[in-house]
Amino acid sequence: MSATSATNFAVQTHPVKAPDEEYFFEGAEKLLELWFCSSTQNETRSLRIIPREEIDAMLDIARCKILHSKHNESIDSYVLSESSLFISDNRVILKTCGTTRLLAALPVIMQLAGAYAGLDQVQSVYYSRKNFLRPDLQPSLHKNFDAEVEYLDSFFVDGHAYCLGSLKQDRWYLYTFHREVEFPAHKQPDHTLEILMSDLDEEVLHKFTKDYAVDGNDCFMRAGIDKIIPAGADVHDELFDPCGYSMNAYMNDTDQYATIHVTPEKAFSFASFETNQDLVCLYSQTRKVLQCFRPNKILMTVFANDISEKGKDAQQQLWDRELPGYRRTNVQFVRLETETLVYAHFVRKASTGQDSSSSDEDDGERSD
């Protein structure tokens, strides 16, 4: 999402710029997913009992704000000024765009989990993002992947860092950590699909502006987002002024979620879709996402643990099949500590396949 004006709390503010300095907003998000557990058999509580004021203070450190929230019996969903936050019993997912300082909030999240829920150990960590268009505008902690890895390594021993994709195209960075624990939770099928889209169709971009839609709900229906999200999902969203869109959804009585964020300025257009739902086929849902946004470039990832049949099916289809209208330029398979990952990059068939928007980010092309 993006915005160039501010209210008391709703959007990121931007400093006044010299007349010859062009406006820019980094739509690509930083994504942190943390799974917690206890080091003892003492009674634990849900992360969802962390007080709202503590969550607000944590997000202040990351430089974003809560706009609104919704809840069911399994998950708390927050639409932020810069993307999204989801909290379930033992998992936190924080996704922030722009020039936020996401990793600066990490020690606070860990402290809150121990203090309020008795979850004093991080069992699994996933930090990921694509390459930035303007890494020079990021805070020092996020200017390059080497700096992010060094910071994460200060908390987690034996973490792993990866760079997936061609260095001549958009690429994707991942840091993972997993701790073998004495008292593991009951294992459930788990998978995550993420679609990162850039250079979107101009007709699509206009749909995510105040000139086209009145508010978030109007945008949800008129832009075709309603065709992507499974029927019956509970949705809350925000259409920013003058442009930009964020949406969270969760499936009733589960901790399954979906989130969409759109930066609709033509010079640096970007949209993301992420979900762990298992109600509909992930490959079919992917095709609906692409029909909605019509991007010229796509970066896709699918995580799946060994008991997620739907996740493994999506991985197989991503590995075996082309997406209609697109040419796959790269596909990679990675076996992680507790799951597998398939990464793929696509360009429209009319495109040359070279990412003219790809930055010169010196992100330490490291992989373990």
UniProtKB/Swiss-Prot annotation:
Gene3D superfamilies assigned to the protein according to its UniProt record, in alphabetical order: S-adenosylmethionine decarboxylase
Inactivation phenotype: Reduced body size as compared to wild-type with the production of fewer progeny. Reduced spermidine levels, but increased putrescine accumulation. Double knockout with the polyamine transporter catp-5 results in a reduced brood size, delayed postembryonic development, and a more marked reduction in spermidine levels and a more marked increase in putrescine accumulation as compared to the single mutants.
Keywords (A to Z) from UniProt: Autocatalytic cleavage, Decarboxylase, Lyase, Polyamine biosynthesis, Pyruvate, S-adenosyl-L-methionine, Schiff base, Spermidine biosynthesis, Zymogen
Its EC number(s): 4.1.1.50
Site (described: Cleavage (non-hydrolytic)): E82, S83
Leading EC class: lyase
Record GO biological process: spermidine biosynthetic process; spermine biosynthetic process
SUPFAM superfamilies: S-adenosylmethionine decarboxylase
Recorded metabolic or biological pathway in which this protein acts: Amine and polyamine biosynthesis; S-adenosylmethioninamine biosynthesis; S-adenosylmethioninamine from S-adenosyl-L-methionine: step 1/1
Cofactor(s) essential for the protein: pyruvate
Protein's job: Essential for biosynthesis of the polyamines spermidine and spermine. Polyamines are essential for cell proliferation and are implicated in cellular processes, ranging from DNA replication to apoptosis.
Subunit structure: Heterotetramer of two alpha and two beta chains.
Family that this chain belongs to: Belongs to the eukaryotic AdoMetDC family.
Protein name per Swiss-Prot or TrEMBL: S-adenosylmethionine decarboxylase proenzyme
Gene transcribed to yield this protein: smd-1
